[in-house]
Swiss-Prot record:
Lineage, broadest ranks: Eukaryota, Fungi, Dikarya, Ascomycota, Saccharomycotina
Region of interest: Disordered: 1-33
Localization per Swiss-Prot or TrEMBL: Cytoplasm
Entry's family note: Belongs to the peptidase M24B family.
Entry EC number(s): 3.4.11.9
Annotated cofactor note: Binds 2 manganese ions per subunit.
Keyword Cell inner membrane attributed: no
Single GO cellular component term: cytosol
The protein's name in its UniProt record: Putative Xaa-Pro aminopeptidase FRA1
Catalytic activity: Release of any N-terminal amino acid, including proline, that is linked to proline, even from a dipeptide or tripeptide
Cofactor(s) it depends on: Mn(2+)
Main location: cytoplasm
PANTHER family, A to Z: XAA-PRO AMINOPEPTIDASE 1
Gene this chain is encoded by: FRA1
Amino acid sequence: MTSKPSTSDGRAHSISHVPGTHMRGTSASHSPRPFRPCADCTCSPGLLSRQGRRASLFLRQLENSRRSSSMLLNELKGAGGGSSAGNGSVYSCDSLCAVNREVNTTDRLLKLRQEMKKHDLCCYIVPSCDEHQSEYVSLRDQRRAFISGFSGSAGVACITRDLLNFNDDHPDGKSILSTDGRYFNQARQELDYNWTLLRQNEDPITWQEWCVREALEMAKGLGNKEGMVLKIGIDPKLITFNDYVSFRKMIDTKYDAKGKVELVPVEENLVDSIWPDFETLPERPCNDLLLLKYEFHGEEFKDKKEKLLKKLNDKASSATTGRNTFIVVALDEICWLLNLRGSDIDYNPVFFSYVAINEDETILFTNNPFNDDISEYFKINGIEVRPYEQIWEHLTKITSQASSAEHEFLIPDSASWQMVRCLNTSTNANGAIAKKMTAQNFAIIHSPIDVLKSIKNDIEIKNAHKAQVKDAVCLVQYFAWLEQQLVGREALIDEYRAAEKLTEIRKTQRNFMGNSFETISSTGSNAAIIHYSPPVENSSMIDPTKIYLCDSGSQFLEGTTDITRTIHLTKPTKEEMDNYTLVLKGGLALERLIFPENTPGFNIDAIARQFLWSRGLDYKHGTGHGIGSFLNVHEGPMGVGFRPHLMNFPLRAGNIISNEPGYYKDGEYGIRIESDMLIKKATEKGNFLKFENMTVVPYCRKLINTKLLNEEEKTQINEYHARVWRTIVHFLQPQSISYKWLKRETSPL
């Protein structure tokens, strides 16, 4: 739906729409719709009237709570108490839908463009990642969120400075936010009027192409003066060298703009420069290190190092003698290699560090404190510790070693442009020089640790099963509690409070280290926002007459979990049941699949989508991602999805991946069913692999339309629910609400 621009609507534009129009985001608030009987089902009038009374009661109770909150707010104001939301009680019932979390970015963009002028930039790029190319970043590295207001985990912001505007105090320009299908709805809600949303894989151009086109348009407006070079700037630590080379190639070949447009490094991060003008710049976290015991990791550092060096020697050129230095950049790879964990990034047990490793030495660059036991561990294993910042000096120093005919220097394809620049300090390290270095004793490779880490050993697999059982017990207790509160007691509970309750339950489990990501607790239309997270204040009330989607996970010392269940607490519509069942059928089909070794997840993605496709439906995210072992909840390199890079990484025995098809109806509801699966040898079929569902949480019986299931699927569900019951019942008090809930949900179809 499109509408004319309005000064009262501060939402982002969509790049795919006609100039002069823009798409409005999902409404931030609306009045509850009156109950209407479903139009396409066989419900009896009695059932419908009970559902109607429950909906009406819910709305009356909500209205009473709002009225009480309003009276309390007036009392506070009258007493000079202001409008503090410290307790959240005044605001917790404010809306049935997601609140408008839009940030006004006008002043921030103005300041940024002033900084761009100092560096003679026509365009500036702000990626999501940190210098380790992390998907999830610390507050210190959330530059893209700061400048754009968009809080999703993936996306790139591009800001231009209009060179035809000569008002230095108020420079003008454009700004876009590019993100993928998981975040389209969220971006429309969070971006203000300064921003245009560029939808990856749907809009006709990429963000890189947009930057070059804008630069060329400005050059044209300035008369394409001889010798004029328009500069696109980026922090060289925040873009990989490979991406830099691809960007340069696109400028030079696709647009024939060599000498007209240039991608330049800006070592002073411009967002960091303006951040303190608006709020305190967060400090980089530097928390204590944790040394994992063998009972949790199952493989000593020396054994991992031996495997790594063998892989590196296989990748090195035949001219070297085996003394190949490799720089480990990814934080989870460092944690896995050293059997250490940290807490520098929320939900991810990692710490800021680099590692330089070869046959003779292992150097860990970190500022994180550690105890005497870890100090002794470093000494025993020959691990030298240096300050985090010294990695750049070290890279410059060992360039001379890399020039030796007997030594090859290797960096991962996740290495930053700045890393390559440090390896070649005599020049500016453009693409041509990189090729020359590569032809000598310098190479960019895919990190062998990425694959080694993804193949879990026997101890990690055993522990992963334990983690799944622990989390399943928590989720059973949580869903039983939620139903008792919302249906049994007709209480008002908002999405955020519910998520906090789930965390409280998880904290009762031994070795619980925290959540593996921010809990997605979403009711009704909020569930259609794929990566929704409830706000602390003004969170939506969970409506028991609508779908509720809960996507959550835990970090235990034993392992990492990622589980989604979609439930309905009263009477779902036939459409909701049908679409839930189509999603469920896709997940079941993928789980049953037996496939040849060396099959990439790209090749089997359609298995999970086939039943949705048959109805003209689909979902805009991958079907499965790797899961770490008390590490990142998103782990590569393999996965099941439609992204072309997944064709390069086959699924292997020992991988743990998610299985999470879904369906999302904008403005109404969302469905996702996610379980974690272990890939195993299918010995009865020769060189074939199969999946084992490790998650033991029941599906929602109310949402299953058995008429859409065949006998094989019914048997599969019944056998799964029988296993869930056998596994979990021993952890529950007999005849408790959790016990009764589990018994009902796992009863045969």
